[in-house]
Amino acid sequence: MLLALILLSAAPADIIDRIAVSVGDRVITTSDLDREIRVTAFLNGIQPDFSPATKRTTAERMIDQKLVELEMENGRYPTPPLESILPALDDFQKRFYPDPAGYQHALAAYGITDDDVKKELLWQRTLLEFIDVRFRPGVQVTDQQIQDYFDKVVAPAATAAHPGQTPALAAYRDQIEQTLAGQREDEQMETWLRDARRRTEIMVHDEALQ
C-alpha cells in the first residue's frame, strides 16, 4: 500500500515526509518520529536508536500523546505555560551541560534544537497534570491498603536498611499514600488509553517504521 505523503514547504528542496501513523484526524510523520527518538535519547543521555523496534515503541507512545491531546482539547483541560518547565530545563543543563557552548554542541550532534527539548519537557509536564486532574479525584486509598503496603514493602526495606530499629507507619504514611495513589492513577490512565484506542480510528503504516 502506498504511504500517504506530505510535502514540507519549509524545506529548501522538495523533501517528502511520509505519514507513519494516523490518529483520528491527526498524523504522526516520519520526521515527527525521528525527532522524538532523537530528543528522548538526548534527555536520557544515550545514542538515538532508529531500529524498527524502537520506532514501533516510539510510535505507540506518540499515539497515546495524540489521544491525550484530543481529550484535552475536547475537555478544555488547562495547559501549563512554557515558563513552568524552564526550571527543569535549567537543572538539566547545569547537571549535564554546565557550559552553554557544550549544550549547543550536543543539540547539534543529536540533530535537534532547544525548542525541541522545551516542547518535550512541556509535554511531560502536561501529561502529568492531565493525569492528576483527570484521575486523581476518583482515587481513594484506604487505611488497610496503606497498612498492607507498609507491612509488605516499606517495613522490610526499612528494617534491612536500619537493623535494630523498628520502623513506624506514621513516618511513612504520607509517602505510601502518594505512592499508592500514583499507582491507581497509572492504572486508570492505562484503562482510559485502551478505551480511547478502541474509540479512535488509528492507522499505522508499517512501511514507515522500518
Predicted regions and their residues:
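Peptidyl-prolyl cis-trans isomerase
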Residues: 15-22, 52-210
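N-terminal targeting signals for Sec/Tat export/insertion, comprising classic cleavable signal peptides
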Residues: 17-48
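Sec-dependent N-terminal signal peptides
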Residues: 1-10
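Boundary of Sec targeting at the N-terminus
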Residues: 9-14, 26
